[in-house]
């Protein structure tokens, strides 16, 4: 994800 610093994958 470009430009995002809070990507959560569960």
Swiss-Prot record:
GO terms under biological process: proteolysis
CC per GO annotation: extracellular region
Major localization class: secreted
Modified how: Glycosylated.
Top-level enzyme category: hydrolase
Statement: the UniProt record of this protein carries the keyword Hydrolase: yes
Protein known as: Thrombin-like enzyme D-V
Organism: Bothrops jararacussu
Source taxonomy: Eukaryota, Metazoa, Chordata, Craniata, Vertebrata
């Amino acid at each position: 994800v470009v430009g995002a610093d809070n990507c959560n994958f569960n």
